[in-house]
Amino acid sequence: LMIAEELNKICNDVGINLIFKSSFDKANRSSINSDRGIKLDDALKIFEKIKTNFNLPILTDVHNEDQCNQLNQDSIIDIIQIPAFLCRQTDLLLAAGNTNKIINVKKGQFLSPTDVKNIFTKIETTNNKNIMITERGTSFGYNTLVNDFKGLDIMKRYEYPVIFDATHSVQQPGGLGDKSGGQREHIPSLCKAAISIGVA
């Protein structure tokens, strides 16, 4: 709640629309000893308070079909996010699509820009065309991600909103052994490059 309040204040001050994003379960942590989060039921209670207090649209990740089915029953979550590692999981994409909510798919680090067409096609079979795709870097050897900015142009051709995730683009997966590292000093430059191309 404190984070939502502060972000809401900052965005109101500068005139930016805010979508509040929070993961209730970080299911793909590097180490079994890392904190993961809370149960979806508990998270929904917190999300409801955020929506009531600040009137913000809310985005959260899902990791299985049961979570999609549970979110299908509520009006709290506005946008369902598919994690990058799960972006090709057909049953998960279909379950998310069947909620008729907005779906944001994180493009897998292993996918080419043209591969996202298959993601769109899967979700479209549910008659849900409220889809967004997020670029978050491409694997480049071990523990390193890079950005090919031609990919943003290519993905825009499919006429769905393209988002650029600068923070995950500078991630170094597993770079610290039992957790990921990162190079945050490059975030401003990558954001400028993405803005120059034009993203959602």
What are these model-derived regions, one by one?
Residues 11-23, 200:
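N-terminal glycine-rich anion-binding loops that anchor highly charged ligand groups
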Residues 1, 18-40:
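Glycine-rich, proline-tolerant flexible connector loops at the mouths of alpha/beta enzymes
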Residues 4-8, 43-48, 68, 93, ...:
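Generic structural signal for well-ordered alpha-helices
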